[in-house]
């Protein structure tokens, strides 16, 4: 067989769907309302804090608060159900403390989740310029940053699914 080996060409990215345009003013309104409710809720239980940052991801927003001096972290973590009730959220997750930060993170589910499309993840320079040929696009993290991994560094990766499902 003397046929030359053809170089594989990736299909054009235009075949993939663009992300839906989302109304950022709705997100900002929801965020401001939740910020106020969160601080008011903590204050009503005698927990003095200040908001030091907000990170919005596709499905969760993390509100970073800094407790006043003398406030025990356990007092904040014990209020998870009360915070969820006052924010009308299905539940909240409290990360106390946030690694490498002098703050407590309160993660609240977004009222409307944002879809993350394959196109927007692989259309980033960090993916296109990845050194490994086995870089896999995973999605977005809680801060809205794109997440990738190298399959070479995952020797024990388990892929599950039914027979014939295209694993």
Feature annotation, model-predicted:
Residues 1-156, 160-165:
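Primarily NTPase-proximal linker/entry elements flanking Walker-type ATP/GTP-binding cores
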């Amino acid at each position: 067989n003397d046929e030359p080996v053809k170089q594989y060409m990736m299909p054009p990215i235009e075949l993939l769907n663009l992300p839906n345009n989302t109304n950022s003013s709705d997100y900002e309104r929801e965020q401001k309302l939740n910020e106020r409710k969160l601080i008011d809720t903590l204050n009503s239980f005698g927990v003095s804090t200040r908001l030091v940052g907000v990170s919005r991801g596709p499905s969760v927003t993390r509100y970073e608060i800094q407790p006043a001096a003398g406030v025990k972290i356990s007092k904040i973590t014990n209020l998870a159900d009360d915070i969820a009730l006052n924010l009308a959220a299905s539940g909240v997750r409290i990360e106390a403390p946030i690694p490498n930060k002098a703050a407590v993170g309160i993660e609240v589910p977004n009222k409307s989740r944002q879809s993350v499309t394959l196109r927007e993840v692989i259309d980033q320079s960090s993916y296109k310029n990845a050194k490994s040929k086995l870089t896999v696009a995973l999605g977005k993290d809680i801060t809205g940053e794109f997440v990738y991994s190298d399959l070479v560094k995952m020797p024990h990766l388990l892929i599950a699914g039914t027979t014939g499902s295209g694993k």
